[in-house]
């Protein structure tokens, strides 16, 4: 039995040496002496500090020189489509209101339903075309101003809105141009003020402190 045990130990050590596991290793005392100053305990599955795996901000894979925010050209598609859908929905509701008002003296019948449906379709198409045209002009002016100035800020928004109103009302003469420009200037200024309200509020609070 003793001879068998010795032969078994020899075969085990031979296999261990063959697979490279028979070399000298580090004891627990040696590993305990390795300093980990300023580091959290390492994960048993990762050979890195887990603190460096936490990302506070979103990361994007972008080409060299690309921006993380969408430009005027990318937002133009969303703006035009959203305005068309909003105009169609508002026009449909307005057409339904007008249709019910104009046919209130008629009994519920097929002619009345057809007349209401025609009013809904007409008003929906009218408002969708109007808002879509305004969005197209606004987006085109915004892209042109952005490419010309080489910057994207609230000044582009206000300028694009003013020029859109002036061009849309250019058929009404100088008075129509002035009214359209004033309307565009007012709406875009309110929009820019709304977008910067949080930043302005924070700045005022810091100044008051």
Curated annotation (Swiss-Prot):
Phenotypic effect of disruption: Mutants are not viable. Heterozygous animals show an aneurological phenotype, premature aging and reduced lifespan.
Keyword Transmembrane in record: yes
Keywords annotated in UniProt: Membrane, Mitochondrion, Mitochondrion inner membrane, Protein transport, Translocation, Transmembrane, Transmembrane helix, Transport
TM annotation in the entry: 73-93, 125-145, 181-197
Topology versus the membrane: Multi-pass membrane protein
InterPro entries linked: Tim23, Tim23-like
GO annotation, biological process: protein import into mitochondrial matrix; type 2 mitophagy
Major site of localization recorded for this protein: mitochondrion
Location in or out of the cell: Mitochondrion inner membrane
Keyword Protein transport: yes
Disulfide bonds listed in the record: none
Described purpose of this protein according to its UniProt entry: Essential component of the TIM23 complex, a complex that mediates the translocation of transit peptide-containing proteins across the mitochondrial inner membrane. Has a role in the activation of stress-induced mitophagy by protecting PINK1 from OMA1-mediated degradation and facilitating its accumulation at the outer mitochondrial membrane in response to depolarization.
Quaternary structure and interacting proteins, as annotated: Component of the TIM23 complex at least composed of TIMM23, TIMM17 (TIMM17A or TIMM17B) and TIMM50; within this complex, directly interacts with TIMM50. The complex interacts with the TIMM44 component of the PAM complex and with DNAJC15. Upon mitochondrial depolarization, interacts with PINK1; the interaction is required for PINK1 accumulation at the outer mitochondrial membrane, kinase activation by autophosphorylation and PRKN recruitement to mitochondria.
PANTHER family the record matches: MITOCHONDRIAL IMPORT INNER MEMBRANE TRANSLOCASE SUBUNIT TIM23 (PTHR15371:SF39), TIM23 (PTHR15371)
NCBIfam families found in the cross-reference section: 3a0801s02tim23 (TIGR00983)
Protein name: Mitochondrial import inner membrane translocase subunit Tim23
Name of the gene encoding the protein in the UniProt record: Timm23
